[in-house]
């Protein structure tokens, strides 16, 4: 796993009270199932690991994630959408660092979150109350009811990020595509 992602998962998130369980990408389905905890909220991986260059068995990880009622989130930065389309193999959410291949020259800092709209958050309301219950900070909107499965996660991620970051220094450089 990319060093920045590893440090975020093992150090920063730990300080915030979030525990992350790491698994070997070559583990058996049984070992993978054993890594899940009752409070597991998501499974995260990279389509091609950086710097190891190992290719993730997306179908195996998607099947495990879905058996345990969590979305599979994949970082597809290294592979890019030209070489790998994770949704076709079962991923629910795909993230990209657009600063790399998509920008080409690292002239702009950016990222993308792409939601397949297929994960049913409403089947697990206790696990995902931020999407399935009214959000007081946005006039009581319930994201899954208002935006459906295809828009709930990405809308919440976008509006809360914009709210929490505050005014954008150069708004012409921020884009919201839904």
Explain the meaning of each model-derived region:
Residues 1-178:
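Conserved PLP-enzyme active-site core in the AAT-like
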């Amino acid at each position: 796993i990319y060093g920045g992602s590893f440090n975020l998962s093992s150090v920063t998130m730990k300080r915030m009270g979030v525990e992350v369980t790491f698994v070997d990408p070559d583990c058996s389905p049984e070992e993978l199932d054993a890594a899940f905890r009752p409070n597991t909220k998501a499974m995260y991986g990279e389509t091609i690991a950086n710097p190891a260059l190992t290719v993730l068995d997306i179908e195996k990880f998607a099947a495990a994630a879905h058996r345990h009622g969590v979305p599979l989130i994949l970082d597809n930065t290294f592979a890019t959408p030209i070489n790998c389309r994770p949704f076709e193999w079962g991923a629910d959410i795909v993230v990209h660092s657009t600063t790399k291949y998509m920008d080409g020259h690292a002239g702009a800092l950016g990222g993308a979150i792409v939601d397949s709209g297929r994960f049913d958050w409403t089947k697990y309301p206790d696990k995902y109350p931020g999407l399935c219950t009214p959000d007081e900070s946005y006039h009581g909107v319930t994201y899954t009811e208002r935006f459906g499965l295809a828009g709930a996660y990405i809308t919440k991620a976008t509006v809360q990020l914009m709210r929490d970051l505050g005014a954008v220094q150069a708004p012409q450089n921020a884009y919201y595509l839904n």
